[in-house]
């Protein structure tokens, strides 16, 4: 716990280097690279940020990630055939392929959980764990696949992908691939210019968009967990109990009674109790004796039936003879 702040500082400084020892092949970079196809990528070794014009308003700031216009601009730099192939195969299939590439990268480097050669290897292990957990949570259960075919990935565990898409997944930085999912889901969750809109698919796209945004922040080290009771407002359990405690004060007798607030025919509320009538609030309920349904209702809670009293055996149990 003492080295938490130092690790956070090293995350920003060291992840952008993306350098490994000369003996091993380099791992997949995590930070954003130039947003274009690997086949048509320009040679620029010092570029580890989003490559665009200097005056492009989408290059920096929050709109760089969340603006629909910025997302459409980034997707326009990718081939339309590859985007159509991603939608055809499904986001779950593409993301599973992406996770498999992360696993193979770590296995090729012989990186173990117990030992790390440098900080970058450790950070790749963390990102790999985060992405695997994300896949199991969002694509591994039928509940998260609502509005989609739940057997799409199960029947096609090794889909046939084009060489262009395979190269893109293998050579593109981690955050850039996640950004592609964010931009495509943002476009899928937009109503503008669409006919015969599938409401369920729209809700699913928006749900997954928010999930991938959280994944993006977790992978680059900027995600901050928040208290659910503060975010959910009235839906949180703590606020629910607080509302009930204000409604039913502690000094009110029988505050858990279902008849609270009801009005009798005489106009008096059941919750209004005089001191003269209150005798013992702790023992107002008496258990119903066994077999008492055979007798008059007036004798159920006032006294035991005479026949029931005479039928007690030596063990003390009230059995009928």
From Swiss-Prot:
Species annotation: Acanthamoeba polyphaga mimivirus
Basic and acidic residues composition-biased segments: 1-11
Domain of life: Viruses
Official protein name in the record: Uncharacterized protein R562
Annotated region described as Disordered, given as residue ranges: 1-63, 223-321
Biased composition (Low complexity): 227-239
Ranges of Polar residues composition bias in the record: 34-47, 241-269, 310-321
